Every structure is written in structure tokens, then in C-alpha cells.
Design a protein with these regions (language model features):
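Structural signal for interior beta-strand "rungs" in well-ordered beta-sheet cores
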Residues: 94-226
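Terminal amphipathic alpha-helical/low-complexity segments used for targeting or macromolecular assembly
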Residues: 1-95, 217, 223-225
Length: 228
């Protein structure tokens, strides 16, 4: 793995290396590992702190320029894109309702349910989670176990504009209809966001349960109920 990291870091600093077959193979290997859930762009340590593997995120960014546009035919439907679609859902134990789409490079754990929705590459969606109708999971976003992303939810990615930290939704969260969570905001375990809540790094999240109000930015504490 260290050898792959060295290649990615060098290619990030010198984009001319993207023409090299060895570099392309390394990038595609990383995407394949992401697709299988063997590596992650971000992961919690034993204390619950999230560690971002920046070099893996860089590999996701570098994947686009080495890919060629191709026509993808799925029954009567046709797409034209650089990134292949994820496949073999039955083997993965994932329920996918037409017209849900996940890209190659996104990990979906067994028990995930995708209603007509979209999961971008580099994302990690853990077991028991439902991605409801018209919800979108952005590039490299990290979604925990038994999460419900309600209809029309938007979980931001890291690619456009390029973000330092992926958006994180921890285990057992409920994200209400039409919520937007972007810019690397972290939603702690078992938190509930009411419908239409919008969270960015500059959003003031005010805890009024104590004697004095307490303000958070960029993170939602575990077990919180957030509403507008």
C-alpha cells in the first residue's frame, strides 16, 4: 500500500506522470480497493476521531483525467461518461431500486438499500443504511450504519469545489427530507436532522439544553435534534 501512496503523491505534484502506464494502474487499483471497501478516504480511530487519508482522496481526483469518455448501455438506457457504473449488487447483498445509480469506486455494504438515488465514487455507505428517493451521496462522503437519508437529501462531496475533509454521517442518524449537509460537516451518532436543515462549515448550531447556549460549527454532537 505504501508503494501506491508514493506513486499517487508524486503524480499529484507532477501531473505529467498521468501519462505513465504504471501511474494509471496505481490510480485504478486505488479505485478498485475503494469499490470493495478495503480502503476508505476517511475512517474513525479507536477513540472515534476521524482520520482523512488525503492520498486516497487525491487518487479519486486523479482518476478523472486518466479516464476516457465511453458510452454505457443499460437495457434501453444510454449514458456517456468517464466513470463506470457499479455492478453485481446481488452478490454484494445490496438492494437497488430502478433508477438508482452508484459509480464504480463507491462502497455499498451488505444490507444497504438504494431507492432511486445516486452515490458518487469514493463514498462509503455502511450496512443497514437507506438512501431514499432522489437523495445524493457525494464523492468520498462517509455514511455510517443504519442511517436513513430521507427523500431529496444532499450529502456533499469533496471534488467540486475541492474540499479538505469529506462530509461524515455517523451511525444511526436520521437525516430528514431535503436536508443539505456539505463542506465536510460531521453529524455525530444517533443525531436527527429535521426536514430542510442546511449545514455548512459556517452554520451556527446552537445547543439550548443547558443553562447557557453553546454554539457548534462544522459538527453536530451525538444524540442531537437539529431543526430550523
Amino acid at each position: 500500500m505504501k508503494k501506491l501512496q508514493v506513486i499517487i503523491e508524486k503524480a499529484w505534484d507532477d501531473r505529467s506522470m498521468l501519462k505513465d502506464a504504471k501511474t494509471k494502474a496505481a490510480i485504478r487499483k486505488i479505485i478498485k480497493l475503494l469499490d470493495a471497501g478495503e480502503i476508505r478516504v476517511a475512517e474513525p480511530d479507536k477513540k472515534g476521531n476521524w482520520i482523512v487519508n488525503q492520498w486516497i482522496k487525491k487518487a479519486v481526483v486523479l482518476y478523472f483525467p486518466i479516464q476516457q469518455m465511453k458510452t454505457i448501455e443499460v437495457g434501453p438506457f444510454e449514458f456517456h461518461d468517464k466513470i463506470p457504473l457499479k455492478k453485481k449488487y446481488k452478490k454484494l447483498g445490496v438492494r437497488v431500486v430502478p433508477h438508482a445509480i452508484a459509480r464504480h469506486g463507491a462502497f455499498l455494504a451488505p444490507g444497504v438499500i438504494m431507492m432511486p438515488s445516486y452515490v458518487n465514487l469514493g463514498a462509503y455507505v455502511d450496512s443497514g443504511t437507506m438512501v431514499d428517493t432522489w437523495a445524493t451521496v457525494g464523492s468520498c462522503a462517509q455514511i455510517g450504519k443504519n442511517v436513513h437519508l430521507s427523500g431529496g437529501v444532499g450529502i456533499g462531496g469533496v471534488l467540486e469545489p475541492l474540499q479538505a475533509t469529506p462530509t461524515i454521517i455517523e451511525d444511526n442518524c436520521f437525516i430528514g427530507s431535503r436536508c443539505i449537509v456539505v463542506e465536510g460537516v460531521r453529524v455525530g451518532k444517533e443525531a436527527v436532522l429535521g426536514a430542510n436543515v442546511v449545514l455548512t462549515q459556517s452554520t451556527h448550531i446552537i445547543d439550548v439544553t443547558g443553562k447557557k447556549p453553546k454554539t457548534f460549527k462544522g459538527e453536530v454532537p451525538p444524540l442531537s435534534l437539529i431543526h430550523i
